[in-house]
């Protein structure tokens, strides 16, 4: 490739050698300036997944929709995407030197959260009577809005490191506790929403746990950072 087909053409060979060396140096330079970071890519993909989950949750619970939206395939694609991110965990662990079980816990908690969101949608649209009952309950509506706000804040946390999700989670926990105090499982008019309330409480715990895990991934303890250095 360097010498070419013409014998004795030293000048052309030198020019081609210089081109190869210059191209190699430029490639190394750009690789050092724009590295392929699995950790950053993983965070951005998880951010996109949370945003998509928030949109699905909002669509399912929108008071402007009279019939259940057909989003089963969207939920399935969302769960598939979370599983497809697993190959990024090993290189992300090498880049951050964090414990691999931490990344595994984030993935598992995220998947469980998405499954709970899907179960909430199924319960919300199970039958027309209970649907309108849950839709007209002010406490549940406040809990739903607080859940949407937390999902948005967690997505922002993954993208930019914003730490304001703690306030949104506190509001969600307060809203869930208020609804739990209002609903009496033995009452006939509230029995239909007791299962939905239980799922909301489970979701609140999962979201709070996910927030703690993301805090460790985004801002690891100093002792762990010193060990990695």
Describe the role of every protein-language-model region:
Residues 88-96, 103, 107, 177-187:
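Short amphipathic alpha-helical segments and their helix-coil junctions
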């Amino acid at each position: 490739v360097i010498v070419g087909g013409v014998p004795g053409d030293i000048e052309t060979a030198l020019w081609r050698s210089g081109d190869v060396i210059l191209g190699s140096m430029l490639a190394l330079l750009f690789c050092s300036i724009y590295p392929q970071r699995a950790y950053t890519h993983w965070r951005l993909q998880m951010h996109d997944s949370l945003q998509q989950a928030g949109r699905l949750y909002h669509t399912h619970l929108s008071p402007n929709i009279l019939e259940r939206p057909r989003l089963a395939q969207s939920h399935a694609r969302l769960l598939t995407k979370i599983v497809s991110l697993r190959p990024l965990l090993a290189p992300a662990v090498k880049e951050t030197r964090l414990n691999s079980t931490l990344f595994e816990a984030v993935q598992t908690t995220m998947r469980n959260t998405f499954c709970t969101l899907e179960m909430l949608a199924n319960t919300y649209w199970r039958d027309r009577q209970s649907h309108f009952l849950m839709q007209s309950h002010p406490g549940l509506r406040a809990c739903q809005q607080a859940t949407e706000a937390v999902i948005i804040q967690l997505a922002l946390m993954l993208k930019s490191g914003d730490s304001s999700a703690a306030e949104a989670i506190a509001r969600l926990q307060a809203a869930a506790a208020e609804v739990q105090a209002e609903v009496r499982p033995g009452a006939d008019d509230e029995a239909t929403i007791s299962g939905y309330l239980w799922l909301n409480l489970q979701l609140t715990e999962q979201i709070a746990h996910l927030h703690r895990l993301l805090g460790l991934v985004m801002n690891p303890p100093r002792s762990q950072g010193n060990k990695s250095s």
